[in-house]
Structures are given as structure tokens and as C-alpha cells.
Amino acid sequence: MEGESPYGSIEFENRASVIRNPDGSIVSKWDNVSVPKHWSQVATDIMAQKYFRKAGIPKHLKPAKEKGVPDWLQPSLYDQAKADQEASEADSSAVDTTVSETDAREVFHRLAGCWTYWGYKHNYFDTEEDARAFYDELCHMLANQMAAPNSPQWFNTGLNWAYGLNGPAQGHFFVDPKTEEVMPSKDAYTRPQPHACFIQSVKDDLVRDGGIMDLWTREARLFKYGSGTGSNFSDLRGDAEPLSGGGVSSGLMSFLKIGDSAAGAIKSGGTTRRAAKMICLDADHPDIEQFINWKVHEEQKVAALVSGSKTIKRL
């Protein structure tokens, strides 16, 4: 109802979130995480371990005072004056002026507020009251697990709006709503990467744009902010096929293993989740049998390691 908090009927409580290895050792631990009381521990762990912004949030913020935007919907900016004041009062320049998200309501506000802000900027609402109702309903639905966006939204959306975070451009683009032209993003967070999955093409070329090595760069850019990607590699020539400069190709599989290793080394969104990657290959490709047996060979390695470790224990 108007004037009431979207969390008025929801009880929140503090919990701990611990992720352990199979041997019991702790991978990550967060204490005093505030979440709705009706949430399961699994939901708590996902929010705390994956979706909380864990570093770099300025402790001191101020409204941007953007013209035409209601006070409650104003973007936030880093308040340098307050940060300097805290440092001077503490008589130390080593004062930590950043914090992390520890309350689910901070995340709900970051998401719903950013969505509402952009909607308000582009006249999606007839009145400010409609915008407020939209914001409140989103917060209520997120807290009650009635709706949830994809992971890149949890990772990236609202970091600039809610906390004034900024960073160098990462090679992303957006469509300018006024000119309808594709423009390069000026920074990493004002127009972040909130999309989940991408299908990318790859040419039978080693180093030029659109080629094999360029694909690994593009994939890394997507993985960094929490998205997944997939490609059909059927255009790449098979093992021992001739090259234009002489010699023969090392084959599709050698390059797929490079891409797989690169993806495995990247944590999506800078969290504990690994990158998501899909590889497709047409059935008439010369290397199709090697491709099909790729996973079989990896499973055989695991079986050999398990068998070997059990044998060693018996010795």
C-alpha cells in the first residue's frame, strides 16, 4: 500500500553463510548476512557468496541531484568531502572508506532502483507515484522470491546508480535511445552488461577480428561480468587440412582445448561461479569423432585418478 515499506510484512534475520570443500575446509565464510527469514540456507548462500558486491562500495555517498529525477530515485555519487573528514578525524590516511553489501535489501534496492530510474528517465511511468509503486512491487517480489533476474543483473545492475561505482570501458556497446545508433560504452558500470547468454560466430582465421584468438578475448569480456557464451565451430578446418601459407592445420580440437582452459580460469562476475561455455559442431565436420570423444576421454581421466587413489590407499 502507498506509504508502506515493501518489506513491511517480511521479517529479516542475520545468518552466517559458509561454503566448504568436500574435506570440510572452508572456501568462503560470511557472518551477519541479513536475509528474509523465510529464505532457505541455499538461497542465503547464493545471495551472500555470489550476488553481494564484496568490495569497493564507498562508505560515504551523496545524491547526484539530477534534474527532473525525484529525490528518492537520485543516483549516488562518492562523497569525497565526507571521506576526507573521516580520515582527518581518525588522524590517519589509511582509513578504509569502502564497504561491501551484507543485507539482501541493499541488493533489492540496487536492482529495483536502477530499473525504476531508467524507466523514469525514458518516460515509462505516467506519474512519480507509478514509479514508486513499480519500485516497491519489485522489492517485494524479489524479497519473497516471486521473481528473480539472471545472474549478470545481480552482479552488475545498479552498481553505478546505487554506489557511484565506475571503471574503464571494457569494449561494450549500447544503443543510444535518442539517435538509435550503436555507441561504445564510456565506462563499465553506467550501462553494464546485464545479459545472460550470447551466441558468437567464429571465422576460420587465427588472429584477425572475428577469428579464433579474437573469440577468446570476446568470451573473456563476457565471462568477466557474469555472462555465458556459445559458438558453432564448424567453419574451422579439421586436423591436417592444408593452410594457405603451407603446412597443415593442428585441428579443431587443439583450439577448443585452449578456449576451454581459458574459460575454466575465469570466475564469472569475479565470484566463485565458473564461466559458462557452449560448443557446437556440425555432424559432418571432419573432426566430429574426436569432438564426441573429448568428454569421454576426460571422464576416463577422472576414473583413472579415482582408481589410482584407491589403489594407493590400500598399499
Please describe what each predicted stretch is.
Residues 1-315:
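Extended catalytic cores of very large enzyme megasubunits
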